[in-house]
Swiss-Prot record:
GO terms for cellular component: cytosol. This is 1,4-alpha-glucan branching enzyme GlgB. Its EC number is 2.4.1.18. InterPro entries: A-amylase/branching_C, Branching_enzy, GlgB, GlgB_N, GlgB_N_E_set_prok, Glyco_hydro_13_cat_dom, Glyco_hydro_13_N, Glyco_hydro_b. CDD domains: AmyAc_Glg_BE, E_set_GBE_prok_N. It holds the Pfam family Alpha-amylase_C. Disulfide bonds: none annotated. Gene3D superfamilies: Glycosidases, Golgi alpha-mannosidase II, Immunoglobulins. It catalyses: Transfers a segment of a (1->4)-alpha-D-glucan chain to a primary hydroxy group in a similar glucan chain. Pathway: Glycan biosynthesis; glycogen biosynthesis. Keywords: Carbohydrate metabolism, Glycogen biosynthesis, Glycogen metabolism, Glycosyltransferase, Transferase. One of its GO terms (molecular function) is hydrolase activity, hydrolyzing O-glycosyl compounds.
Length: 744
């Protein structure tokens, strides 16, 4: 039935129902008409059979609205009332009755300053007003929804709270900013919702909320209303101490973990371990192993398990796989209370093409470039953020801020930075567009990274911003004031590639590859490096680290222990992927748990014990970390002994008296009466030896201290004579007086 009324202008009803009426709040809700002589209320409630207007003050009925058409449009005058008042709608459906606050009576909750900063590209907390946020508005509690869709004709939110009706809650349009918002009272935590967007082409697309803080488990993709309660943090002392922290002169031994496959539970090991179990098992394990940092591979919601989290759709939503957001907070809180810093792998380089995600969000290339030569990433068939667009920068800045602020992460590791820096990254000559100077540098991405790092360090002193950057781009860890990118650390991909290639050679031929062990020291102090043996080195058919090494098991395990000894004593912070600490035999499989049963075998237990002791040694002796990024913290004693596959070097702390001498032998030959130069006339003792029987070695060790002889050697005034273990690493320290012993 349709009632002829003067409540709607001609054509407005059809435009509203067809998703083409942009200024919905000028039509629906309470409005003064007839030059202020009357009040009318208009509403669109599909499925309703009658609607009454009640006074919110006393609950009395003011008017019954007329049904304008069969699509759920109702309208009516408020009797003699001419002054606006707060009201409720009593809606009668065929099987039930509902009392609701009409969302179209509420004004916008958007703050002009927030909107301005968002549009300027400098907003760091966009998540406080976009997405779904609990608010109290004119004494009414509810959820404020806000989304950016500047080219949409109409945006509606639909969900469990309105029976997924895409006409029930159409958002208010703010043309100047491109934002749409609405306040809805009748919403409950964990209800699902999506946005129905009438795009610029007249099509309707259904999208997840880019700022959703929780999402449905895959393969579903609805966003979820957050819980109201806040988490009660217990790490205030940690954060206070972190603010004065100087990470470059502190030990940093990072354990990289993918939570989905570290350890699973259930009879078939297919059930994810939740945060409570990770608190009980992973945190004590990290502490026992002596790692100072935990790095989580991406945990923003991702639909495809095989992406390992590197193709996130819900950038603000911790994945459902391990529990809720407060479970993640509790996990990080416990890490902090146990003295473990937590880093997050963050992916601002690209995003996937999932239709419910950011791709052509409002029918236009909103978050990505419209030209595929700038907007598409050929390696992963993903899309590249438009770093030159202010609102996109605000989105990404805010996401970084969100994880550091809301979850107390101690830093971010940025994935695939090289792909951001170069316009021609993985492209043929005809597949990219030069910058305005004719070069291949992505000036917009460079500016974004510089601003990101500067802002995050300013907001969160003591954090670490880390780049996975695989080229020779200069100044990755230089200050932005010096035209650098402003990162705190950079992964040393060159060291990783060279040394893995070296250990994959048969010892007989390593003499011809000796430079692959030594070349890293040519550039070791040009950046602030992290030596990384990450997940990327044990996937896609590359095999495990153990698998890369030739020879029988004795040679494989001995070489791996020696290699770890070289890594832990080489300048640079450390990162080791899970499973490598006990020499997993198979390459990493994201669909199953690590092979923990291997620890019942002595060689694997020996490698784990070796890594644990390396971490303890590393933290105990400042010479191994204080001058990681300064050339005066390192000295070659012998880097030219290629024929014997031997390296000898010395590490120094701030105090030159604090030093460590390292001998690495990458041949299976034992060297007796081997002379090593030392800086002082003191006795030296063998602190660690990878060939010790405790680690599964042949026990070619130096049990007794060696007296320094006044025999200049290798550029040093004194020397000692030792036995060098086969395929081994031997670490030596001077026997200091008790008061001079290094401390953590």
């Amino acid at each position: 039935m349709t009632v002829a009324t003067p409540y709607f202008q001609q054509g407005s009803e059809i435009a509203l129902l067809n998703g083409e009426y942009t200024d919905v709040f000028s039509l629906l809700g309470m409005h003064s008409v007839n030059d202020g002589k009357a009040l009318v209320v208009r509403c669109l409630i599909p499925g309703a059979i009658s609607v009454d207007v009640l006074s919110a003050k006393d609950g009395r009925k003011v008017a019954t609205l007329e049904q304008v058409n069969e699509h759920g449009l109702f309208a009516g005058k408020m009797g003699r009332r001419v002054k606006s008042f707060a009201y409720l709608l009593r809606v009668q459906y065929p099987l039930c009755e509902q009392l609701i606050n009409d969302p179209y009576q509420f004004d916008s909750l958007l703050n002009p300053d927030d909107v301005y900063l968002f549009g300027e590209g400098s907003q760091l907390q966009t998540y406080h007003f976009q997405g779904a946020n609990w608010r109290e508005h004119h004494g009414v509690k509810g959820v404020h929804f806000c989304v950016w869709a500047p080219n949409a004709k109409q945006v509606a939110v639909m969900g469990d709270f309105n029976l997924w009706d895409n006409k029930r809650h159409i958002l208010r349009h703010h043309p100047a900013s491109g934002l749409w918002d609405i306040f809805i009272a009748e919403v409950e935590p964990e209800q699902h919702y999506k946005y129905a967007i009438s795009d610029m082409h007249g099509n309707q697309v259904i999208k997840s909320d880019p700022y959703a803080v929780a999402m449905q488990p895959s393969p579903h993709n609805a966003s979820k209303i957050p819980h109201v309660e806040r988490y009660d943090w217990q790490d205030s002392q940690w954060l206070a101490d972190r603010a004065s922290h100087q990470p470059h002169v502190q030990p940093m031994s990072i354990y990289e973990v993918q939570l989905a496959s570290w350890r699973r539970k259930g009879d078939d090991s297919q059930e994810y371990t939740d945060y409570s179990q990770l608190i009980a098992e992973l945190v004590p394990y990290i502490k026992e192993m002596g790692f100072t940092h935990l790095q989580l591979m991406p945990i923003s919601e991702y639909p495809f398990d095989g992406s390992w989290g590197y193709q996130p759709v819900g950038l603000f939503a911790p994945t459902y796989r391990f529990g809720d957001a407060n479970g993640l907070r509790a996990f990080i809180d416990e890490c902090h209370q146990q003295g473990i810093a937590v880093l997050l792998d963050w992916v601002p380089a690209h995003f996937p093409r999932d239709p419910h995600g950011l791709v052509r969000f409002d029918g236009s290339c909103l978050y990505e470039h419209d030209d595929p030569r700038k907007g598409e990433q050929p390696d992963w068939d993903t899309l590249i953020y438009n770093y030159g667009r202010a609102e996109v920068r605000s989105f990404l800045y805010s996401n970084a801020h969100y994880w550091l602020d809301e979850f107390h992460f101690d830093g971010l590791r940025l994935d695939a930075v090289s792909s951001m820096l170069y316009l021609d990254y993985s492209r043929r000559a005809d597949q990219w567009i030069p910058n305005k100077f004719g070069g291949r540098e992505n000036l917009e991405a460079i500016s974004f990274l510089q601003e990101l790092n500067a802002r995050m360090y300013q907001c969160f002193p003591g954090i670490n911003m880390i780049a996975e950057e695989s080229t020779a781009w200069p100044g990755v860890t230089q200050a932005t004031s010096n035209n650098g990118l402003g990162f705190g650390f950079k992964w040393n991909m060159g060291w990783m590639n060279d040394t893995l290639r070296y250990i994959s050679c048969d010892p007989l031929f390593r003499r011809y590859h000796h430079g692959e062990l030594t070349f890293s020291l040519v550039y070791a102090f040009t950046e602030q490096f992290i030596l990384s043996l990450s997940h990327d080195e044990v996937v896609h058919g590359k095999g495990s680290l153990l698998h890369k090494i030739p020879g029988d098991d004795w040679q494989k395990f001995a070489t791996l222990r020696a290699y770890y000894g070289f890594m832990w004593t080489h300048p640079g912070k450390k990162l080791l992927f899970m499973g490598n600490e006990f020499a997993q035999r198979n390459e990493w499989n994201h669909n199953q748990s690590l092979d923990w049963h291997l620890l019942t075998y002595a060689p694997h237990q020996g490698v784990q014990d070796w890594v644990r002791d390396l971490n303890q040694c590393y933290q105990q002796y400042p010479a191994l970390y204080q001058r990681d990024h300064h050339s005066d913290g390192f000295q070659w004693l012998d880097c030219n002994n290629a024929d014997n596959n031997i390296l000898v070097f010395c590490r120094f702390g701030m105090d030159k008296q604090q030093h460590v001498v390292i001998v690495v032998n990458m041949s299976p030959q034992v060297y007796y009466d081997f002379r090593v130069g030392v800086p002082t006339a003191q006795n030296y003792r063998e602190l660690l030896n990878s060939d010790h029987r405790h680690y599964g070695g042949g026990d070619v060790v130096n049990d007794n201290p060696c007296e320094a002889q006044v025999t200049p050697w290798q550029g040093m005034s004194h020397s000692i004579v030792i036995t060098v273990p086969p395929l081994g690493c031997s670490i030596w320290v001077p026997e200091l007086d008790e008061q001079d012993q290094p401390t953590q």
